[in-house]
């Protein structure tokens, strides 16, 4: 993976996800951070991206709205999206997957769980 966008309104969460990616060997990828869905969408439009990791609850544009925009874009439609959230529940997880999320991970996500999700994505 060459470029990964991390969208979360918490700087601490973004730093933690960045650290998880480094631990599992993706630290060489270009890791780009956004504080909300609107910033993330802007970054996704700028340059080809291999993966979007997004929080669900963010100001300005939440993760579900971002996911809808990504999946409705002809250019971004095939972009894998993992939602990482503390607001997860089975019904919400089903809803996000129906919108096109590759997976939904609960915070705090561990490097092992993130690695397993990414391995599923690659295979």
Give, region by region, the residue ranges found by the protein language model.
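Acidic, metal-coordinating helix/loop segments flanking the phosphotransfer/catalytic sites
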Residues: 33-51, 68
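C-terminal output helix
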Residues: 109-118
